[in-house]
């Protein structure tokens, strides 16, 4: 036999219906209905007020909550969210602190609750962190100690044309130096980098993948672009193939760039470039970065103290090195034999030093290219090559 269910409202009405008969005291009825005598008297006083729905439960919420978000702060939070629809609670709180210094704003968790309540944020499943395989080298802490560059994955603008954005950042400050639509060639990349070098000076190193146009399968893994970097005193740093986590800071910026500029894509390359320019300004000057203590990259960034030279000097080698000029076919003349070094080094001067075993190591600037053995074979040092991709389509370059 099921338990008998009772309704508190019906119990209160029944209690006072019996009380009105005059046959029972309020204490007796309270005991019969399983409530305290004090509770029964509370309901008796409420009934005597003449209120129509005296038997209903009342809200137990406090009449005043000192921690409730003030209406003007609530309006400011929602207005800022409309200005920056991609900002989460932490960045909104940081941005509010920048724009209204000295004002105590709600915690980021409270701002998140406000956004959920207003339907401005959807609950998302927690993403599992990928397990890192091997050590991921951290970037330098000094400004311009390392820049990172890469092509964000290509996409098509609404007119059907292909768009290849090249991005360039300072690793330490996260400052986005440039985002430019160019052809994915050595000439296109060099033009953008030279403009950045002239405007902001030279970094100590540049991190990139080892695919074209940044790297090659030649000696030392160098491309013509990397040879130019070495002559400028910039160290090329290649991440392992298929390991984007080794350029994680740059890849994280790409995710934000994609969300804010290419979903959906612009109508043509010129409009898309305008979006990239706007994003760069907001990313550097308005968007707080959690790794920077919720400050902006622009508040940390300073140009390099190494200016772009008017004339690039020849490489310097120790006195124990013999010098050779790489010929037009990528070869050097060594002890009467032609030894192929690499087409990326055509016209460049390399240094050759003898090793203890009688072989000879070939160097260009600070990079070891490979070894010439006793058979006059050049055994080149090169990072592993990423898997081959299909030939790229003709790219669109935004005209300014």
Regions found by a protein language model. Give the residues of each.
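Short, amphipathic alpha-helical "recognition" segments used to contact nucleic acids or chromatin
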Residues: 7-24, 74-83
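Mobile-element integrase/transposase regions
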Residues: 68, 72, 109, 115-175, ...
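Charged alpha-helix within mobile-element recombinases
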Residues: 218, 224-309, 351, 355-356
């Amino acid at each position: 036999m099921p338990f008998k269910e009772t309704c508190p409202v019906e119990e209160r009405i029944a209690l006072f219906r019996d009380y009105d008969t005059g046959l029972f005291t309020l204490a007796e009825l309270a005991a019969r209905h399983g409530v305290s005598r004090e509770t029964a008297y509370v309901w008796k006083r409420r009934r005597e007020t003449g209120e129509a729905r005296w038997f209903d439960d009342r809200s137990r919420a406090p009449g005043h909550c000192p921690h409730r978000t003030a209406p003007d702060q609530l309006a400011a939070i929602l207005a800022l969210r409309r200005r920056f629809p991609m900002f989460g609670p932490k960045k909104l709180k940081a941005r509010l602190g920048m724009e209204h210094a000295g004002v105590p704003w709600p915690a980021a968790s409270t701002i998140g609750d406000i956004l959920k309540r207003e339907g401005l944020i959807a609950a998302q499943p927690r993403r599992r962190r990928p397990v890192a395989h091997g050590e991921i080298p951290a970037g330098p802490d000094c400004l311009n100690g390392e820049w990172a560059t890469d092509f964000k994955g290509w996409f098509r603008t609404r007119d059907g044309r292909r768009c290849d954005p090249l991005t360039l950042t300072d690793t330490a400050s996260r400052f986005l130096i440039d985002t430019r639509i160019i052809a994915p060639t050595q000439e296109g990349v060099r033009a953008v980098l030279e403009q950045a070098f002239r405007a902001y000076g030279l970094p100590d190193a540049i991190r990139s993948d080892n695919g074209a146009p940044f790297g090659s399968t030649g000696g030392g893994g160098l491309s013509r672009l990397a040879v130019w970097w070495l002559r400028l005193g910039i160290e090329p740093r290649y991440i392992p193939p298929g390991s984007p986590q080794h350029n994680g800071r740059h890849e994280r910026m790409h995710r934000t760039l994609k969300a804010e500029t290419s979903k959906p894509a612009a109508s043509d390359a010129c409009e898309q470039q305008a979006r990239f320019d706007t994003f760069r300004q907001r990313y550097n000057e308005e968007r707080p970065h959690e790794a920077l203590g919720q400050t902006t990259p622009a508040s940390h960034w300073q140009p390099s103290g190494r200016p772009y030279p008017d004339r690039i000097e020849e490489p310097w080698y120790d006195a124990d090195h013999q010098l050779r000029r790489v010929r037009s076919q990528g070869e050097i003349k060594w002890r009467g034999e032609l030894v192929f070094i690499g087409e990326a080094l055509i016209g460049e001067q390399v240094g050759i030093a003898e090793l203890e075993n009688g072989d000879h190591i070939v160097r260009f600037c600070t990079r070891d290219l490979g070894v010439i053995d006793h058979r006059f074979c050049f055994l080149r040092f090169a990072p592993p090559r990423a898997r081959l991709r299909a030939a790229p389509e003709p790219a669109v370059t935004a005209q300014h």
